[in-house]
Amino acid sequence: MSTEHMEELNDQQIVRREKMAALREQGIDPFGKRFERTANSQELKDKYANLDKEQLHDKNETATIAGRLVTKRGKGKVGFAHLQDREGQIQIYVRKDAVGEENYEIFKKADLGDFLGVEGEVMRTDMGELSIKATHITHLSKALRPLPEKFHGLTDVETIYRKRYLDLISNRESFERFVTRSKIISEIRRYLDQKGFLEVETPVLHNEAGGAAARPFITHHNAQNIDMVLRIATELHLKRLIVGGMERVYEIGRIFRNEGMDATHNPEFTSIEVYQAYADFQDIMDLTEGIIQHAAKSVKGDGPVNYQGTEIKINEPFKRVHMVDAIREITGVDFWQDMTLKEAKAIAAEKKVPVEKHYTEVGHIINAFFEEFVEETLIQPTFVYGHPVAVSPLAKKNPEDQRFTDRFELFIMTKEYGNAFTELNDPIDQLSRFEAQAKAKELGDDEATGIDYDYIEALEYGMPPTGGLGIGIDRLCMLLTDTTTIRDVLLFPTMK
């Protein structure tokens, strides 16, 4: 038992345990049993929205509701309270002469946080509030701890993230944010299902990290006596399924990267990866735009999205620009020109762009320029395509300029929201790219990956031309809920 549960009980906790014992003495289970509701709070509000006090009285409608007791007032023989369920709150009006003395005692002794079931007549008060005039109250569950004092809006950030259940009880805005997240994911699934994609599941435990540039979490399989890694991407397994003939697949799932934490990064996060046979990166651009716009429309409607005071024109066609053109437009440096690594490093020094030890190709310098000068300017949805081969080990080379790949990233509000490309399906080229990554790893690039020989073997059986995509679900949820930190869209973010 943890020290937290061995703590000395305070006065309120002692009183609540005494009430629990009293319920048992009356033959009432303090933690209840199954209870049949006829409606939730919002259903009743919607159903009777257009009826005034007299009309409701004439209809003589009844309902059975249940929820957590969150407010309570009144003295003597009459009381008012609010029950909170998943949809919101509804008032209950309790009279001793309507429920009986014994039943009224259950209400009277109920504490905030307890769960009650209420049967009664649907009514409207003189103030116009829809309420249930109780005819019977059922005790459903005893809360042995009082709700936080700041119940109507938990404000302590540490408590919000560590004890999300308290945040959900007390912050309706937070509750609705996670409902919105669920809807976003459901709508993405719906969009892809309707386009003939098959949702699949691939392993979380891998023998070799691959499919992304990231440091993995390492674990050990006792029975096999081998070290394994938690997946840093789902890419290579999904492309094996394209080899197997599935043609259109996607997976929404947890990814694990042993890296730093900040406003937009958590060590475990949710991504969606999508692969489509006989498609290229241009087709995947169209698909990406469709996914993002469909998700936005489902929770925000047809118009633009407001994020932290900036209007994001997510409902309009996304801008498309080559990485080299974007760099030239901002810095004047033209990387279309052929140049040696030495020349590129000299330009980087002139522009004060840091050069890492593992930058062994001009493509590394080009990417560094993009990150240094261009990313921070990308506010409206923008597809940046044409990444250098050096930083795109799984993407197909552009047939017209082999220095670059048919790859794109989607940027909104300076952040990357998606990464996609025409997949490399040449096993010989893929092996040489893997070998270059392995060399970079030896030179100190912690994010470079090793060689997945099994994946090379799969490619040798033949993979059709394929387009692939990865989108960070958490960042998309941040955008569509106007949230500034990833922890506010993760129910249980990583904590120390």
Curated annotation (Swiss-Prot):
Keyword Magnesium: yes
Binding of Mg(2+) 1, residues: E409, E416
Example of a GO MF term: transferase activity
Domain of life according to the entry: Bacteria
Residues reported in the UniProt entry to bind Mg(2+) 2: E416
Signal peptide: none
Keywords on record: Aminoacyl-tRNA synthetase, ATP-binding, Cytoplasm, Ligase, Magnesium, Metal-binding, Nucleotide-binding, Protein biosynthesis
Cofactor: Mg(2+)
GO cellular component terms given for this protein: cytosol
Principal subcellular localization: cytoplasm
Any Pfam family the entry gives: tRNA_anti-codon
CC cofactor note: Binds 3 Mg(2+) ions per subunit.
A GO BP annotation: lysyl-tRNA aminoacylation
Reactions catalysed: tRNA(Lys) + L-lysine + ATP = L-lysyl-tRNA(Lys) + AMP + diphosphate
Subcellular location: Cytoplasm
SUPFAM superfamilies: Class II aaRS and biotin synthetases (SSF55681), Nucleic acid-binding proteins (SSF50249)
EC number(s) from the headed UniProt entry: 6.1.1.6
Family membership noted in the UniProt record: Belongs to the class-II aminoacyl-tRNA synthetase family.
Entries under PANTHER family matching the protein: LYSINE--TRNA LIGASE, CHLOROPLASTIC_MITOCHONDRIAL (PTHR42918:SF15), LYSYL-TRNA SYNTHETASE (PTHR42918)
Xref: NCBIfam families: lysS_bact, PRK00484.1
Complexes and interactors: Homodimer.
Protein name, entry field: Lysine--tRNA ligase
Organism: Streptococcus pneumoniae (strain Hungary19A-6)
